[in-house]
């Protein structure tokens, strides 16, 4: 085995034959790489790629070039034509091709000869497209039909890019013709007629020809303008008629420009926000909602409402509601559960130290079930409306309050009858002897009211009254005692008026629009009562009105004990037969 000692910038080392061969190859390769090349350097593998700038990301260059290449000439031409108001139309032309050989298929027998060849190579097909834009034509060629379109669009772009953009002007108060390219002639006729307030009428004037080849003539009239159109169908004839009359409508003078006045929207002023726990908060708010909001602001349990009792006659129910807030409880009464619940909430607000909200006239006064504020000394006289038998709804109202009773809230006045306010009562002839100029009247006698109520109840339920018979026997001048029960309410009321010494007066009205009689009754008791009845005849009207008065008189003792009434004006109820 031969050994060679090689020294290359390193200490000498003994190498074997195979190691010498590898070492020689490595030494020979090092000088070659360091020798500069005098000839032109060959292109590297990445020579064809663009040199990227380190400052710009490669993705931006790629996206910019891709975006530039994605916009084809046809897309650019479409955008330019929209600005110019022109429509490009592409028309394909038959591609050009030379005559080709039959490829030896013309041999008889249909067999190929032993030697066959193509006489010449087949040239590629060239597609042609003709582009027309606004009267100008451009021809494009390409290997594909799309390439031919791009060629024609590129030629059109070179010429159309130099044309100025047209100014959009309104013609005859209408949109320009370019804007109406996508609108049918019939739509344009209706638009012009609508702006000029002209009537439009399409009518088929005549039709001719055999059933399978009919010809229609349609006549259109737009105000004073008339046009006719002919076609093989009604639709085509209607369109042609619209085209004919549209030419006349375009000659009309332009409409005057009218400036529309923009409506002024008044901004609502923001109310002053008060804390929900302050006593002044909630003036005018429903007491039920106000009480719930106060409890929510305090972060306490919401109020609990409970129905305690129901009392009174079926038509004169009185409900008692109880509300509980923490350790406090309050009650409220009313003709229905809603009113009782509201009154209970008001009483609870007073217990908690909040001001009771003033009643808002959300409903007509005669139908309102709420009371006006409590009268203060020196403020003058107050009038509050309430229902008969409703009692003291608030439980905290002053006993000196004066009340006036309208007709029942769940009933309505018939046609021709006015509410019994003092002025109306005076107009229909109600006795005004009890009303002085200062609207004062002596308070009713509670004992007499109790006797009257007792007699009325006896007459209502039995037809006879032992109490009245005893009074008549003691008072010789009062009259005779009737024999047998009284069945009609009018007779019972007449008998009661003779016993107690008050007057009853009936006033009859003509038939209303429902062919019914209406009668008005005036009772001069203390307090005076007014009612009316409706029926098929006068007698039934009198009975119904008298029945209402008797029912009120039967409850006088309850009203006198629960709530004294010293106010002016008669009490009024209504009834229907």
Swiss-Prot record:
Which superkingdom is the protein from?
Answer: Eukaryota
Modification Asymmetric dimethylarginine, positions? 108, 115
Task: Name a GO CC annotation attached to this entry.
Answer: endoplasmic reticulum
Q: Which SUPFAM superfamilies match?
A: dsRNA-binding domain-like
Q: Which parts of the sequence carry Phosphoserine?
A: 176, 278, 390
Q: Where is the sequence biased in composition, kind Basic and acidic residues?
A: 366-384
Report the SMART domains cross-referenced here.
DSRM
Q: Which GO BP terms sit in this record?
A: anterograde dendritic transport of messenger ribonucleoprotein complex; cellular response to oxidative stress; germ cell development; intracellular mRNA localization; lncRNA-mediated post-transcriptional gene silencing; modification of postsynaptic structure; positive regulation by virus of viral protein levels in host cell; positive regulation of long-term synaptic potentiation
What InterPro entries does this protein map onto? DRBM-containing_protein, dsRBD_dom, STAU1_DSRM_3, Staufen_C
Q: Where is the composition biased (Polar residues)?
A: 34-44
Give the Omega-N-methylarginine positions (modified residues).
115
**Where does the DRBM domain lie?**
72-162, 184-251, 286-354
UniProt modified residues of type N-acetylserine: 2
Where in the body, by tissue, does this protein show up? Widely expressed. Expressed in brain, pancreas, heart, skeletal muscles, liver, lung, kidney and placenta.
Q: Where is this region: Disordered?
A: 34-55, 360-397
Q: State the Gene Ontology terms under molecular function.
A: double-stranded RNA binding; mRNA binding; protein phosphatase 1 binding; RNA binding
Compartment(s) of residence: Cytoplasm; Rough endoplasmic reticulum
Q: Which pairs are disulfide-linked? A: none
Keywords recorded for this protein, A-Z: Acetylation, Cytoplasm, Endoplasmic reticulum, Host-virus interaction, Methylation, Phosphoprotein, Repeat, RNA-binding
Query: Domain text from the record?
Result: One of the DRDB could be involved in RER binding. The C-terminal contains the tubulin binding domain (TBD).
Q: What assembly does the database describe for this protein?
A: Binds tubulin. Binds with low affinity single-stranded RNA or DNA homopolymers. Interacts with CASC3 in an RNA-dependent manner. Identified in a mRNP complex, at least composed of DHX9, DDX3X, ELAVL1, HNRNPU, IGF2BP1, ILF3, PABPC1, PCBP2, PTBP2, STAU1, STAU2, SYNCRIP and YBX1.
Summarizing the function annotation, the protein's role is: Binds double-stranded RNA (regardless of the sequence) and tubulin. May play a role in specific positioning of mRNAs at given sites in the cell by cross-linking cytoskeletal and RNA components, and in stimulating their translation at the site.
- The entry's protein name is Double-stranded RNA-binding protein Staufen homolog 1
Q: By which gene is this protein encoded? A: STAU1
């Amino acid at each position: 085995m031969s050994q060679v000692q090689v020294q290359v910038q390193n200490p000498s080392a003994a190498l074997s034959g195979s190691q010498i061969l590898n070492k020689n190859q490595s030494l020979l390769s090092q000088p070659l790489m360091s020798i500069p090349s005098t000839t032109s350097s060959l292109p590297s593998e990445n020579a064809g790629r663009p040199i990227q700038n380190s400052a710009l990301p490669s993705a931006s260059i790629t996206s910019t070039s891709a975006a530039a290449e994605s916009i084809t000439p046809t897309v650019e031409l479409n955008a330019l034509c929209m600005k110019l108001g022109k429509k490009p139309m592409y028309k394909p032309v038959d591609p050009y091709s030379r005559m080709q050989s039959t490829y030896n298929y013309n041999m008889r027998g249909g067999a190929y000869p032993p030697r066959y060849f193509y006489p010449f190579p087949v040239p590629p097909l060239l597609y042609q497209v003709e582009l027309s834009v606004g009267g100008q034509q451009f021809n494009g060629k390409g290997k594909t039909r799309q390439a031919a379109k791009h060629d024609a669009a590129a030629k059109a772009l070179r010429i159309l890019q130099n044309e100025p953009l047209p100014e959009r002007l309104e013609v005859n108060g209408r949109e320009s013709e370019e804007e109406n390219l996508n609108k049918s002639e019939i739509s344009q006729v209706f638009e012009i007629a609508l702006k000029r307030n002209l009537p439009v009428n399409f009518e088929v004037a005549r039709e001719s020809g055999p059933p399978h080849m009919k010809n229609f003539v349609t006549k259109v009239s737009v105000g004073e303008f008339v046009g006719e159109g002919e076609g093989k169908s009604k639709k085509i004839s209607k369109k042609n008629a619209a085209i004919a009359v549209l030419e006349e409508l375009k000659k009309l003078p332009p409409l005057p420009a009218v400036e529309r006045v923009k409506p002024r929207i008044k901004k609502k002023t923001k109310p002053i926000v008060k804390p929900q726990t302050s006593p002044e908060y909630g003036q005018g708010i429903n007491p039920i909602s106000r009480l719930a909001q106060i409890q929510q602001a305090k972060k306490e349990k919401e109020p609990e409402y409970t129905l305690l009792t129901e009392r009174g006659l079926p038509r004169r129910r009185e409900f008692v509601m109880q509300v509980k807030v923490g350790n406090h409880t309050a009650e409220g009464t009313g003709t229905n559960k809603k009113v009782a619940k509201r009154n209970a909430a008001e009483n609870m607000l007073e217990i908690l130290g909040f001001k009771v909200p003033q009643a808002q006239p959300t409903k007509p006064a005669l139908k309102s079930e709420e009371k006006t504020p409590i009268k203060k000394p020196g403020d003058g006289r107050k009038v509050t409306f309430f229902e008969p038998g409703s009692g003291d709804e608030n439980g905290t109202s002053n006993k000196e309050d004066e009340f006036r009773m309208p007709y029942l809230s769940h009933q309505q006045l018939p046609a021709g009858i006015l509410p019994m306010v003092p002025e109306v009562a005076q107009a229909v002839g109600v006795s005004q002897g009890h009303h002085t100029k200062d609207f004062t009247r002596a308070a009713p006698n509670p004992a007499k009211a109790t006797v009257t109520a007792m007699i009325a109840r006896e007459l209502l339920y039995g037809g006879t009254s032992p109490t009245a018979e005893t009074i008549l026997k003691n008072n010789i001048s009062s009259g005779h005692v009737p024999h047998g029960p009284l069945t009609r309410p009018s007779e019972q009321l007449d008998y009661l008026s003779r016993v107690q010494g008050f007057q009853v007066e009936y006033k009859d009205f003509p038939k209303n629009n429902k062919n019914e009689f209406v009668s008005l009754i005036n009772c001069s008791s203390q307090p005076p009562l007014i009612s009316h009845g409706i029926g098929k005849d006068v007698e039934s009207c009198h009975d119904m009105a008298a029945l209402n008065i008797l029912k009120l008189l039967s409850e006088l003792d309850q009203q006198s004990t629960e709530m004294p009434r010293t106010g002016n004006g008669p009490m009024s109820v209504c009834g229907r037969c």
